[in-house]
């Protein structure tokens, strides 16, 4: 694959390794001062002048080996063939499991599902359904307790055995800074607020559900983000899906990254605006859409678009990649578009102060028109926020469906957010927040480096706490999840349709609560399972650096 300007060659289904430092927009094309692109086993170096990036920006998307891709398609073909065979046997009542057959009283009903979706659920998903929705019965901290369950009808239903699998290492929760716990100052403060305010508000903010705690939280969020004002919501998903329709509508254009979260996709669709998709993190693709939007305008009428809104995420939760924000902002300014940044996974998890991807790149928050994030991950709570200009927030207070109609956030949840955010900012009189941010960065670099040394294909940015490990073949999705649980490691496995059909993966989420001993235990088991299932596909395995200390990460800017 020929690298595009700026070292961005992240195309589907082809993948390539890449790292970019100090890029800039020049004459409409993205340049970079140092870039490394690896494709088909070859390394290309590009050196040009530039100055957008103040720190190294390294992301890896190794190309799927051809043999693995072919075998993955063959695996799906075999499963599909046996699926049709099982449907035939069910039709003639030879198949002993009858849960997938239609009930007599519903035979004349209109189907709820499309044919392919129905077939996929019956014959492929059900084979590995036991890997999802596992119930836990403890705080989702570094370790969790899982309720054991069994199925006697091929995963169509489950029964609890009464046993508890204790001390399972939790590599799946978004507990980035370790605030998901039931002891400590945050939990004590939330318990006190519960005594004063109760558990719920039973009203909307527009009526009698606007507490002083809401005002305190929003002022704190605005100060934390470095913006004029902020507005909070009780649900993170609705923060996207219900606010985007308030910002754009008919006659507006949305430019959305192809890997954006479902909440952004739903919000864009509900808005009624025209939607165009650009390739993931590909600035050339985005710039082409911006140029076309300005040159050609709206379809048929050719009138100028009322607004152009760019939708991106800070950390992409399935890829582990980080948005190329300096380049996006440069393009946004050049073509006079608006920028909507979803920091659900990056807020708290990136940057020397934990203020997200804007802090990570050392950018000005005022360059982002709409800053969105959630409290469900780094803050160990629930809900979401929108930050920006005061005029924007005042407008959303009266036009956002989530602000006008939804019940306001629970007081104990708000106190959890307030206390944890003050801890991150250092306003609690301790350095705990700073230590958690640093610990997460160290854990991320260490875990990613060790997996690459073992020979696994790992996606994403080297600073992203979301670590996708590629499994590819459908049979290995269930096998990996089950084998890891046998070894007391809880992981999340993901397959089609949440990922491309040949890019099934396991997704690890690092936490500041993970100690080196916990990570080493998990890595040892992952290494053994990788050998057992033959998952070490990488052709670019780095040599282990035995003399490198564990405490290796620094947020000091790299000299150009």
Curated annotation (Swiss-Prot):
Do you know which PANTHER family this protein is assigned to?
CLASS II AMINOTRANSFERASE/8-AMINO-7-OXONONANOATE SYNTHASE, SERINE PALMITOYLTRANSFERASE 2
Q: Which InterPro entries match?
A: Aminotrans_II_pyridoxalP_BS (IPR001917), Aminotransferase_I/II_large (IPR004839), AON_synthase_class-II (IPR050087), PyrdxlP-dep_Trfase (IPR015424), PyrdxlP-dep_Trfase_major (IPR015421), PyrdxlP-dep_Trfase_small (IPR015422)
User: What GO annotations for molecular function exist for this entry?
Assistant: pyridoxal phosphate binding; serine C-palmitoyltransferase activity
Pathway assignment: Lipid metabolism; sphingolipid metabolism
Mark the transmembrane ranges. 65-85
Activity regulation, free text = SPT complex catalytic activity is negatively regulated by ORMDL proteins, including ORMDL3, in the presence of ceramides. This mechanism allows to maintain ceramide levels at sufficient concentrations for the production of complex sphingolipids, but which prevents the accumulation of ceramides to levels that trigger apoptosis.
Q: Output the superkingdom of the source species.
A: Eukaryota
Q: What coarse category fits the chief subcellular location reported for this protein?
A: endoplasmic reticulum
Question: Is Lipid metabolism one of the keywords UniProt gives this record?
Answer: yes
A single Pfam family it belongs to is: Aminotran_1_2
Q: Could you tell me what induces this protein?
A: Expression in increased by palmitate at protein level but not mRNA level. Expression is down-regulated by microRNA miR-9, miR29a and miR-29b-1 (at protein level).
Q: Which residues carry this modification: N6-(pyridoxal phosphate)lysine?
A: 377
What is the tissue localization of expression for this protein?
Expressed in astrocytes.
State the compartments where it is located: Endoplasmic reticulum membrane
Q: What is this protein called?
A: Serine palmitoyltransferase 2
Q: What is the stated purpose of this protein?
A: Component of the serine palmitoyltransferase multisubunit enzyme (SPT) that catalyzes the initial and rate-limiting step in sphingolipid biosynthesis by condensing L-serine and activated acyl-CoA (most commonly palmitoyl-CoA) to form long-chain bases. The SPT complex is composed of SPTLC1, SPTLC2 or SPTLC3 and SPTSSA or SPTSSB. Within this complex, the heterodimer consisting of SPTLC1 and SPTLC2/SPTLC3 forms the catalytic core. The composition of the serine palmitoyltransferase (SPT) complex determines the substrate preference.
Describe the protein's quaternary organization and the partners it interacts with. Component of the serine palmitoyltransferase (SPT) complex, which is composed of SPTLC1, SPTLC2 or SPTLC3 and SPTSSA or SPTSSB. The heterodimer consisting of SPTLC1 and SPTLC2/SPTLC3 forms the catalytic core of the enzyme, while SPTSSA or SPTSSB subunits determine substrate specificity. SPT also interacts with ORMDL proteins, especially ORMDL3, which negatively regulate SPT activity in the presence of ceramides. Forms dimers of heterodimers with SPTLC1.
Annotated source species: Rattus norvegicus (Rat)
**Per UniProt, which keywords does this protein have?**
Acyltransferase, Endoplasmic reticulum, Lipid metabolism, Membrane, Pyridoxal phosphate, Sphingolipid metabolism, Transferase, Transmembrane, Transmembrane helix
> What's its catalytic activity?
L-serine + hexadecanoyl-CoA + H(+) = 3-oxosphinganine + CO2 + CoA; octadecanoyl-CoA + L-serine + H(+) = 3-oxoeicosasphinganine + CO2 + CoA
What cofactors are annotated for this protein? Answer: pyridoxal 5'-phosphate
Q: Which CDD domains match?
A: KBL_like (cd06454)
Protein family (similarity comment): Belongs to the class-II pyridoxal-phosphate-dependent aminotransferase family.
How is this protein annotated for GO cellular component? endoplasmic reticulum membrane; serine palmitoyltransferase complex
Q: How does it sit in the membrane?
A: Single-pass membrane protein
């Amino acid at each position: 694959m020929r690298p595009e300007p700026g070292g961005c060659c992240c195309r589907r289904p082809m993948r390539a390794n890449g790292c970019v430092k100090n890029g800039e927009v020049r004459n409409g094309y993205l340049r970079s001062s140092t870039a490394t692109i690896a494709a088909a086993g070859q390394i290309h170096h590009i050196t040009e002048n530039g100055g957008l990036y103040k720190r190294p920006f390294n992301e890896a998307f190794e190309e799927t080996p051809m043999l693995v891709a072919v075998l993955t398609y063959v695996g799906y073909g075999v499963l599909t063939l046996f699926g049709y065979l099982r449907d035939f046997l069910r039709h003639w009542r030879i198949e002993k499991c009858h849960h997938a057959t239609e009930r007599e009283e519903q035979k004349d009903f209109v189907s709820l599902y499309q044919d392919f979706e129905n077939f996929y659920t019956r014959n492929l998903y059900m084979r590995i359904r036991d890997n999802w929705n596992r119930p836990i019965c403890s705080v989702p901290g570094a370790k969790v307790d899982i309720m054991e369950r069994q199925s006697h009808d091929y995963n169509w239903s489950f029964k609890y055995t009464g046993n508890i699998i204790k001390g399972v290492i939790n590599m799946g929760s978004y507990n980035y800074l370790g605030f998901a716990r039931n002891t400590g100052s945050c939990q004590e403060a939330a318990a006190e607020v519960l005594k004063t305010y109760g558990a719920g508000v039973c009203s909307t903010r527009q009526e009698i559900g606007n507490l002083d705690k809401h005002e305190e939280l929003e002022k704190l969020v605005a100060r934390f983000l470095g913006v004029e004002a902020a507005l909070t919501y009780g649900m993170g998903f609705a923060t996207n899906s219900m606010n985007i329709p308030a910002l754009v509508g008919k006659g507006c254009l949305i430019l959305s990254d192809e890997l954006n979260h479902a909440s952004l996709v739903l919000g864009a669709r509900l808005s009624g605006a025209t939607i165009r998709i650009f390739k993931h993190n590909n600035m050339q693709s985005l710039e082409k859409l911006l140029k076309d939007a300005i040159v050609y305008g709206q379809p048929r009428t050719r009138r100028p678009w009322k607004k152009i809104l760019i939708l991106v995420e800070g950390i992409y939760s399935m890829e582990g990649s980080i948005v190329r924000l300096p380049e996006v902002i440069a393009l946004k300014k050049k073509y006079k578009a608006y920028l909507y940044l979803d920091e659900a996974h990056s807020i708290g998890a990136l940057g020397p102060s934990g203020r997200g991807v804007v802090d990570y790149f050392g950018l000005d928050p005022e360059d982002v028109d709409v800053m969105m994030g959630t409290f469900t991950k780094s803050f160990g709570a629930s809900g979401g926020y929108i930050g920006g200009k005061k005029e924007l927030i005042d407008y959303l207070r009266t036009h956002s469906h989530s602000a006008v109609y939804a019940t306001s956030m629970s007081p104990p949840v708000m106190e959890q957010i307030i206390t944890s955010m003050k801890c991150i900012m250092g306003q609690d009189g301790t350095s705990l927040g700073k230590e958690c941010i640093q610990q997460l960065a160290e854990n991320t670099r260490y875990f990613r480096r060790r997996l690459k040394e073992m020979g696994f294909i790992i996606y994403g940015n080297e600073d992203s706490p979301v670590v996708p490990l590629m499994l590819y073949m459908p049979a290995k999705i269930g096998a990996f999840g089950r084998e890891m649980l046998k070894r007391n490691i809880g992981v999340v496995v993901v397959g089609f349709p949440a990922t491309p059909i040949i890019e099934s993966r396991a997704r690890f989420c690092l936490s500041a609560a993970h100690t080196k001993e916990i990570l080493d235990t998990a890595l040892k088991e992952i290494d053994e399972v990788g050998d057992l299932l033959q998952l070490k596909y990488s052709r670019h395995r780095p040599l282990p650096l035995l003399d490198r200390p564990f405490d290796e990460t620094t947020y000091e800017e790299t000299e150009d």
